[in-house]
Amino acid sequence: MTMIRKRLLIALSMTILLLMGCSKETVPSEPESTENDETVDAVTEVSDESENMEIAEVEEAEVAETVEPKYITIDFTGVTETHAEGDSVIPLKWNILSEEDNGIDFADEWYASENLSLPMIGTDWNSFSDENYEYLWEGEDLYIYENGTGNCLYVLHYPTDKWYVNGNNAYLKDGIFYGASVANGYAQPNTCFMFAYDLKNEKLLWRSADQSYNSMNFVVEGDVLICGYGFTAEPDYLYQINRNTGEIIDRLLLKKMPDLIVEQDGKLYVHTYSYNYVIEIE
């Protein structure tokens, strides 16, 4: 009887164990985490966005570098001496230090002997520069380029004798262009003057008196423009013009017409047809 019970208990235990084994649910394996995939996707998106931003910046820079120049024609028809409202200017003091007969030499030879030079580019006398711009005459048009970028900002057309599309006879400051219109020959009405022109608003600000300019260049000294005029059987002068108004504020009589002017160390080196002048200014 005892043996039978033992066998029954063993059989019952085995049955229970067997049933328990069959009843266990199979735990499905968890899918691999997608966290890594999401991180990779995020990095890829950031990389793509950065690349797109860089491309956009390059495209914007290219657009900025290829700005189209502004073409302006300045017409002086019917325009007489005109002055603008502006600050008055005290004339520079000047004193002739030397006056020498030059034997009718070339200006560049004298300047070279004095270790001086005009801000010319090349040897064709049609291109020159200042601290901000390069000016280039091509035919009867003046091209103004920005230093650094090389962008052509303006192309200006205005009447002046071809002989005078040489030398550094243009100046751009704060959007105002300073230039000159010259007719070669004896004095004529409405000729040989300097002018100031607002390039943004395309407006003439002032026009100096007739026969106040036929030198090949002018010098800028703060608010004073120094230039010259003269011709056969006419008085020959250096002029000081108020850059704000266009008014002549002083003049200095010379023996011959001033054609080129160089400033260095507080002195003007003025070349004329047959005389060289050194003039102190302060």
How should each PLM-predicted stretch be described?
Residues 65-120, 151-163, 203-210, 237, ...:
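Aromatic (tryptophan-biased) beta-strands that constitute blades/sheets of beta-rich domains
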Residues 80-82, 115-129, 160-173, 210-222, ...:
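Repeated scaffold domains used in trafficking and secretory/extracellular systems
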Residues 136-138, 185-191, 230-236:
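Short, solvent-exposed loop/turn segments at conserved positions within beta-propeller repeat blades
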